[in-house]
Amino acid sequence: YLGATVQVIPHITDEIKRRIKGISNDIDIQITEIGGTVGDIEILPFLEAARQIRKELGQENVMFVHVTLVPYIGPSTEMKTKPTQHSVSVLRSSGISPDVIVLRSDRELNDEIKSKVSSFCDVSFEDVISAPDLGDIYEVPLKMHEEGLDKSVDTRLNLSTNEPDLEKWKNMLHLKAGVEKTVEIAILGKYFGLPDSYLSVVESLNHASLHNQVKLNLHWEDSDNFNVEDLNKFDGVVIPGGFGYRGIEGK
């Protein structure tokens, strides 16, 4: 920086924008997730960079989808929208107004809740999306289509797309639900402290089991403390790669 004082704005925000814009020039749509919680100090530079990107690329080329939690209060049997209202208010104070609000909850949200969020957060009713917990993560695309999220994106970005053909996806879920045979697979690893350490391996096994019409039953075996003979009870063993001494020894 040639001796200049390095500041959050513009230096850090400019670098964030450079990385977001520099992913590829050969794409039609780019999805950029900004994690964390609105209001946290760590997220402020990213929100400012996102605000600037919309200004630079044009309102018609950028949309903001805000995901919030709608908790269920058991004793009063109520779904509380106040956290969502507060979150949107804080987000707006950063200069960003969400185009779509996705409401995460442990159950389906009725039109009354969605209408309330629409009214208090100044978002069209059609752009308030219910995203309840589902039995299978692969049901989510169908649920988002049912809620009209794809139509909201099409409208906001002026896209001209046809109705998606989801029959193969539906058939895949139908086949998955009808599987009866089970296979026992062990993952022999070291990094079990963080659940997502072997996420790609687990998802690959899920895809393989679905393709072979079997139900996957996973077992986690610590490579630092296991008996080789115990592996005989499994139909298969997966040994993921690792790093350094602990990534090799014991495997």
Model feature map: region roles:
Residues 1-28, 32-251:
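N-terminal beta1-alpha1 cap of cysteine-dependent amidohydrolase-like domains
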